[in-house]
UniProtKB/Swiss-Prot annotation:
The protein's name in its UniProt record: Nuclear transport factor 2
Gene symbol of the encoding locus: NTF2
Subcellular location: Cytoplasm
Lineage: Eukaryota, Viridiplantae, Streptophyta, Embryophyta, Tracheophyta
Protein's UniProt keywords contain Protein transport: yes
Cellular component terms (Gene Ontology): cytoplasm; nuclear pore central transport channel
Function according to Swiss-Prot or TrEMBL: Facilitates protein transport into the nucleus. Could be part of a multicomponent system of cytosolic factors that assemble at the pore complex during nuclear import.
Length: 122
């Protein structure tokens, strides 16, 4: 599978899981993984799961507009940049967001080493 196909499959899996079973996202991170969420940093799978689980909405739906990827590093990793919009309820206005993942290979799969998320206002 080429890098673009891996990136698109990861993005589809990540946001489907976020929208339907957010606690299951913890399996995509490791102890050395880092999330920067709106400028706040969280280190390790447990801290990341805690942050994602504490978000102040029960429902969420992501619509993805773009997925771009590049190879990253000699170990076969990749950078994945995502832009799109999300809704936190059926009557809520969509919010634009950008998110970047650095994926690293581990045991025939990939895990999220770095994750940066920002809402885009304006």
């Amino acid at each position: 599978m080429d890098a673009d196909a891996v990136a698109k499959a990861f993005v589809e899996h990540y946001y489907r899981t976020f929208d339907t079973n957010r606690p299951a996202l913890v399996s995509l991170y490791q102890d050395g993984s880092m999330l920067t969420f709106e400028g706040q940093q969280f280190l390790g799978a447990a801290a990341i799961a805690g942050k994602l689980g504490s978000l102040p909405f029960a429902q969420c739906h992501h619509d993805i507009n773009t997925v771009d990827c590049q190879p990253s590093g000699p170990q076969g990793g990749m950078l994945v940049f995502v832009s799109g919009s999300l809704r936190t309820g059926p009557d809520e206005h969509p919010l634009k967001f950008s998110q970047m993942f650095q994926l690293l290979p581990a045991g025939g799969n990939f895990y999220v080493q770095n994750d940066m998320f920002r809402l885009n206002y304006g």
